[in-house]
Curated annotation (Swiss-Prot):
GO cellular component, one term: cytosol
Protein known as: Polyribonucleotide nucleotidyltransferase
CDD domains found in the cross-reference section: KH-I_PNPase, RNase_PH_PNPase_2
Gene Ontology annotations of biological process type: mRNA catabolic process; RNA processing
Domain S1 motif: 669-728
Signal peptide: none
Length: 728
């Protein structure tokens, strides 16, 4: 049976009962040329543990884009980061739908069978998984709908195409049921500014005294709290349409709900009364143990004491029952203190941020480092500068070629950070998710035209909540400590929410205890001018826009407080220039790149070995980038390459007129009115006389110029056959 639905700017075609018919629920979904299979399977036996055993796996098949997997093994193997992050998005969106007490192992598999470059795979995959789950015999009463919102040319766009998203200032992904929001992912997308800004570049046509760095600016496109609410409101309306459309279309095709048993809520009023009467202060003392391991140890001791009491033995209370009731009692104390007393377990008010300490460049041989400590959460964040060859190469189904990512963020969470002796493993979904959030928060502040590849690593040394946001703060300062001129500092804070009846409280800078016993985890990161990234997960059925707005504005207060402390730390940074890589960026005639490479790469290999440098070449633009540990060797390699191109130019008949024209008749102070022959990233070339040009560096340009304009200039310097100009 086939069903076609037009909703939220796209036509979705569903095939029901056509494939995977032995699954509990399955659907084949098509949007344009994208085809996705979503299947749900459930075991008949419950697990003994008290948790929801749900597994979500999003899988991309390379044949979906007409490709054969690369590498030695010609088949799909370990999931990539995009697959893992998409699996996490689907899991976080669907997990709240399952009824309380549901303990049957359940698997949701989403396979991309055909990929259209213009179709958003994350939106399609979540909606396909949602419909498959809704059609199954699992007791899920309403389908989730996921939408993406862009902001293009000042207007919000629902479900933009992939090419449209590249021109968007906003990437907002929201999932919900009807008018209830369940999950939010957001990032701002930077773009180049149109106006001319001061840039210092390295180029053989420039005055060498100006070759001090390579700086560009772009618009970070942070979003204000009000604009963010407008975007989320629009997404909520689209979710309502989508959720209603799915329910109406598939209500009559939903399987009969299976006759399942649910784990009963363990309740024993007598145990709770006994704990409240004799152990209330002990539980409060345990709550005040901020470390997770210490708190768990204290609660375990209390449970053992109660189990050994005469009352417990007489009433038949075993330790498992007591521990369960004790956990609920602890949660009640935490939440009651927040709602009624406006006080938290560590004595803070609802809006208070924990004490913060910041140290920078504590690692002498690292390019940049920051030890950021907030309460009992501590992140050591380290930045390393590399070249284009160090960029992370990734393949995406929707991209024809591999994508080079020059900004990488890795998040590591060892067990000792929470006092646990757990084995060190490869990063899991949580680590990838936290690292991705920190990367999204910091990315808009990174120069898009930076000649460096940047790798930021966050080592969590202590954790009691908000470790990902500590990584954002530490990462922003770590970049500055490595000499990276980010546009603005970026800070992050984790917000919480507690609902009790008609009352609620929004918490700033939540601890692990408040994350566990609260109703919301809402991470907000941004600069002094707005939000660059946020992530929200709701444990309730949903959240209203009014409460969300309150949380956003409360987060802004905390962010401003943290940024003020970060500004002070930034002013005290001493960059360790000795360990930073030295870099030269210059241009040659693109046709001479082949001479630099040499036959079978012989010449460039000799240069790399002789001068101990790394070299990146852009064949199309003629750009040469040399990086190394010693400036003398980098400069020597640059001179050597220029000699190669000059040698080839003279012997082969090529002549760079701008470089070899006779400049002897020119003197410093000579004044000219010349035509702008060429605009470059680093300045304007002005025609003087006799075919000779001079360079007006961009740092001396005070108003926009264009080729063909006439401008008055005077000679400021003559070096190496090149003329530098000032405005006259």
């Amino acid at each position: 049976m086939q069903c076609s639905i037009e909703v939220n700017n796209q036509i979705e075609i569903f095939d029901l009962n056509k494939v995977a018919k032995q699954a509990a629920g399955a659907v084949l979904m098509r949007v344009k040329n994208t085809v996705v299979l979503a299947a749900v399977a459930r075991e008949d036996a419950q697990v003994e543990e008290d948790f929801l055993p749900l597994t979500v796996q999003y899988i991309e098949k390379q044949y979906a884009a007409g490709r054969i997997p690369g590498g030695y093994v010609k088949r799909e193997t370990k999931p990539g980061d995009f697959e893992t992050l998409t699996s996490r998005i689907i899991d976080r969106s669907l997990r709240p739908l399952f009824p309380k007490g549901y303990a049957y192992p359940t698997q949701i598999v989403v396979m991309v069978l055909s990929s259209d470059p213009e179709v958003d795979l994350q939106v399609v995959s979540l909606n396909a998984a949602s419909v498959a789950l809704y059609l199954s015999d699992i007791p899920v009463n309403s389908p989730v709908c996921g939408v993406r919102v862009g902001h293009i040319n000042g207007k919000f766009v629902i479900n933009p195409s992939n090419s449209e998203l590249k021109n968007s200032a906003l990437d907002l992904y929201v999932a919900g049921v009807k008018d209830e929001l369940l999950m939010i992912e957001m990032r701002s997308l930077p773009n180049e500014q149109n106006e001319i800004v001061p840039v210092i570049a390295i180029d053989p046509m420039m005055d060498p005294s100006l070759n001090e760095g390579f700086v560009s600016r772009q618009k970070m496109n942070e979003f204000s709290e009000d604009l963010m609410i407008d975007a989320i409101k629009l997404a909520t309306e689209a979710i309502l349409k989508g959720s209603n459309a799915y329910e109406e279309a598939f209500r009559n095709y939903k399987k009969e709900t299976a006759n399942l048993e649910y784990k009963p809520e363990i309740e024993n009023e007598n145990v709770a009364i006994y704990i409240n009467e004799f152990y209330k202060e002990d539980v409060k003392a345990a709550i005040n143990q901020m470390a997770k391991s210490e708190r768990a140890s204290e609660l375990s001791k209390i449970a053992k004491q109660i189990a050994l009491s005469e009352v417990a033995q007489k009433e038949g209370w075993d330790e498992a029952l007591i521990s369960n009731i004790l956990g609920k009692y602890k949660k009640k104390l935490v939440r009651t203190g927040i709602i009624k007393d406006k006080k938290r377990a560590d004595g803070r008010g609802l809006k208070d941020v924990r004490p913060i300490s910041i140290e920078t460049n504590i690692l002498p041989n690292a390019h940049g480092s920051c030890l950021f400590t907030r309460g009992q959460t501590q992140a050591l964040v380290v930045t390393t500068l590399g070249t284009d060859n160090d960029a992370q190469m990734s393949e995406y189904l929707t991209e024809k070629n591999a994508v080079a990512d020059k900004f990488m963020f890795n998040y590591n969470f060892p067990g000792f950070s929470v006092g646990e002796a757990s084995p060190l493993k490869a990063p899991g979904r949580r680590e990838l998710g936290h690292g991705n959030l920190a990367k999204r928060a910091l990315y808009p502040s990174i120069d898009l035209n930076s000649p460096y590849s940047l790798r930021v690593v966050s080592e969590i040394l202590e954790s009691n909540g908000s470790s990902s946001m500590a990584s954002v703060c530490g990462g922003s300062l770590s970049l500055r400590a490595a000499g990276v001129e980010t546009i603005k500092l970026v800070a992050g804070v984790a917000m919480g929410l507690v609902f009790e009846g008609d009352e609620h409280a929004v918490l700033t800078d939540i601890m692990g205890l408040e994350d566990h016993d609260g109703d919301m985890d809402f991470k907000v990161a941004g600069s002094k001018d707005g939000i660059t990234a946020l992530q929200m997960d709701i444990k309730l059925g949903g959240i209203s826009l009014d409460v969300l707005k309150e949380a956003l504005y409360q987060a802004k207060e905390a962010r401003d407080h943290i940024l003020n402390l970060m500004v002070k730390a930034d002013e005290e940074i001493v960059v360790n220039e000795d360990v930073l890589p030295k870099l030269e960026l210059f241009s040659v005639d693109p046709s001479k790149i082949v001479d630099i490479i040499g036959q079978a790469g012989k010449t460039i290999k000799e240069i790399i070995e002789k001068f101990e440098v790394s070299i990146d070449l852009d064949r199309d633009k003629g750009e040469v980038k040399i990086a190394g540990g010693e400036r003398q060797k980098v400069e020597a390699a640059k001179d050597y390459i220029i000699q190669i191109t000059q040698k080839e130019q003279r012997s082969g008949g090529f002549r760079n007129k701008r470089e070899y024209k006779n400049v002897t008749p020119f003197n410093i102070g000579d004044e000219f009115e010349g035509e702008i022959k060429k605009m470059a990233a680093f300045g304007a070339f002005i025609s003087l006389r006799d075919g000779v040009d001079g360079l007006l560096h961009i740092s001396k340009i005070v108003s926009p110029l264009k080729e063909g304009d006439t401008i008055k200039v005077k000679v400021s310097d003559i070096k190496g056959g090149k003329i530098s100009l000032d405005l006259n």
